[in-house]
Amino acid sequence: MVRVTTMLASVTLLTRNARAATPALAVLALGFSLVPIVLLHLLTIETMNPVRDVISDYVFPDGGAVLLGCASLSLAAASLLARQVLLANGLPRLSLESVLLALWAAGLVVATFFPTDPTRFESSFSGAVHRYAGATMFVSLPLAGWLLARRYREATALRWLSLAAGIASFAFLLAHLPLLENSVPEFLGLFERVLYALLYAELFALVAVAKSEVDA
């Protein structure tokens, strides 16, 4: 009986330690996902215009698909790690927040394996899937963050970053409507990079909320 009790205590301790380490793993995954993006920017500085060209266009230079894929999959992993921490600390698995975080991560994975089309080229099946995945991503994460901030009242930073990301996402998606396709702004790439900066900031704030739940 004593041995069983000791084993159960050890398992409980390991579970707690793993749960406590998960937010740190999420931060590491977020940081790692930025490395390929920085490399892509440096490697394509003479061939791509970061003000005009969107991030998805990094798939076209040699090696770009691999680096961009690493960034997207690392970002998805970080998001799922943060989600798992929240689930382990009481967030219902089928709550809207949980589903939206899963959709954001799924959108990243789908967009990775269905690359975009070159700007102003006729849309392919892969390009269409990529755009729908992107739309899912840009709607899901800001809304998830906003709802989580309502659930965790102390998450002020998450609330405002989610609002800013939501407004930026809405404006960015407007530029991709079919009626506006022929008047895509020349600064679309810069605008998307600002949007991603907000999304990253939101994710770091989300991980902070998850960590506070572990520490509570």
Spans of model-derived segments:
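Short, charged juxtamembrane terminal tails flanking transmembrane helices
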Residues: 5-13, 211-216
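Hydrophobic, aromatic-enriched alpha-helical segments typical of multi-pass transmembrane helices
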Residues: 13-212
